[in-house]
A protein has these predicted regions:
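Short helix/strand-capping hinge loops at secondary-structure junctions
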Residues: 158-160, 164-166
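A cross-family glycoside hydrolase active-site/sugar-binding cleft signature
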Residues: 141, 164, 189-191
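N-terminal glycine-/serine-/threonine-rich beta1-alpha1-beta2 phosphate-ribose binding loop
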Residues: 3, 11-14, 22-159, 175, ...
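Short beta-to-alpha linker loops that shape the active-site pocket of alpha/beta-hydrolase fold enzymes
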Residues: 73, 167-168
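A contiguous active-site-proximal alpha/beta segment in oxidoreductase catalytic domains
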Residues: 168-202
Length: 202
């Protein structure tokens, strides 16, 4: 074997080991896992007693779905624009850390003839928004680090929740969202636009 081939194989092995090590390190400290034939296998945590899964969950029909948007920087405004044209939807609240972003979305709503939505902003704006009883769905389009806390707050306040990807930053947060969805019997949906291609299903 020539030197070039040996170095290529050694470099590939180093990358593979580094990748699996990084995967293991990205798991939260409380996540239990083990190695099995060169693969990281994550153990399913103990499920709360009596809690039912939400596979096939059907919520009561809502005549007009009252939607709130949290995160209006990149994907959020496009989502607001699309929802403005969906029958049976009422946008009732807009929230972003920067007030101007929410006001810009409000401007688009006005332009297409929709009634104004309430505006929330700042670090804790989403918490106030989630306390409202007149919101059915919270659409989360914040930066990645805030997807989980906003979705958690929405579920804890009895709202259906739709989250741009990634929905969480570690497996512990994923299980927290699953548990909240099961406990509250509210939908928690990951807004992935490519689910059934070969790459996703293999």
């Amino acid at each position: 074997m020539n030197l070039k081939k040996v170095l290529t194989i050694a470099f590939a092995a180093l990358l593979a080991l580094g990748g699996t090590s990084a995967q293991a390190q990205s798991l939260s400290p409380s996540t239990k896992w083990h190695w099995e034939k060169g693969t990281i296998v994550v153990d399913t945590p103990t499920r709360p007693a009596g809690q039912q899964h939400v596979l096939g969950l059907k919520a009561e029909k809502i005549q007009t779905v009252r939607v709130a948007f949290v995160g209006l920087g990149m994907r959020g405004p496009g989502a607001v624009n699309r929802f403005c044209h969906i029958p049976g939807v009422q946008i009732v609240a807009l929230c972003d850390y920067e007030k101007g972003r929410a006001e810009a979305c409000q401007g688009y709503m006005k332009k297409v003839g929709l009634p104004p939505a309430d505006i929330y902003f700042g670090e804790n704006g989403y918490k106030e928004l989630c306390k409202r009883p007149d919101i059915d769905l919270v659409y989360v389009a914040t930066d990645w680090d805030h997807h989980f806390p906003v979705a958690k707050c929405a579920l804890e306040n009895g709202k259906h929740t739709a989250i741009e990807v990634p929905s969480a930053m570690n497996l512990e947060q994923c299980w927290d969202l699953i548990n909240l969805s099961e406990k509250t019997r509210k939908h928690c949906m990951i807004l992935e636009n490519c689910c059934y291609d070969y790459y996703e299903l293999r």
